[in-house]
Design a protein with these regions (language model features):
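N-terminal acidic leader/helix
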Residues: 1-25
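Amphipathic, hydrophobic secondary-structure cores in small proteins
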Residues: 16-18, 22-46
Length: 69
């Protein structure tokens, strides 16, 4: 398993916990909005920042389709 995949799993599980949602629901929402690959590809940015920064960026991606920064 790649570092990117490990981090993606860590990210989605922790994001779901933070939002008090089942992980499967978070993944389904990200898939419906076409965000899975974009979030996965953001590994270089997300893994070097506070995890809360990733959450904020994902929220913005979900609402606007654009990265926060």
């Amino acid at each position: 398993m790649t570092d990117e995949m490990r981090f993606f799993i860590f990210l989605i599980e922790n994001y779901a916990c933070e939002k008090q949602l089942p992980t499967a629901d978070v993944l389904r929402t990200w898939e419906e909005k076409g965000l899975v690959q974009e979030i996965y590809d953001s590994y270089p940015l997300y893994h070097t920042e506070r995890i809360d920064n990733a959450y904020e960026d994902i929220e913005n991606l979900s609402k606007t389709g654009k990265h926060l920064w």
